[in-house]
Amino acid sequence: MMLKMGAMFVLLLLFILPSSQQEGDVQARKTHLKRGFYGTLAMSTRGCSGTCHRREDGKCRGTCDCSGYSYCRCGDAHHFYRGCTCSCQG
């Protein structure tokens, strides 16, 4: 009787461990795909022009023109330098 219970316990462990590993793999894959997706949506400064500047209240304001893009905005230039710049997307 103890031998049967031991065998059942081992079989249960063999079943549970691979399924939990697969779940971890799925979560890792989702994270990787999400990172790739948002990286693709990054704003571009190429093809953008306009007058974008920081106001006294600290916010970036101005007019931007993005030829060949569907979305254009004036905002912080985080990666390049401290200040404001026009960014395009789409």
From Swiss-Prot:
Its main location: secreted. Residues 1-21 form the signal peptide. It is found in: Secreted. Residues 22-46 form a propeptide. The modification Glutamine amide is found at residue 89. One of its GO terms (cellular component) is extracellular region. Keywords: Amidation, Disulfide bond, Neurotoxin, Secreted, Signal, Toxin. Expressed by the venom duct. GO terms for molecular function: toxin activity. Contains 5 disulfide bonds. The cysteine framework is VIII (C-C-C-C-C-C-C-C-C-C). Belongs to the conotoxin S superfamily. This is Conotoxin Ca8.2. It comes from Conus caracteristicus.
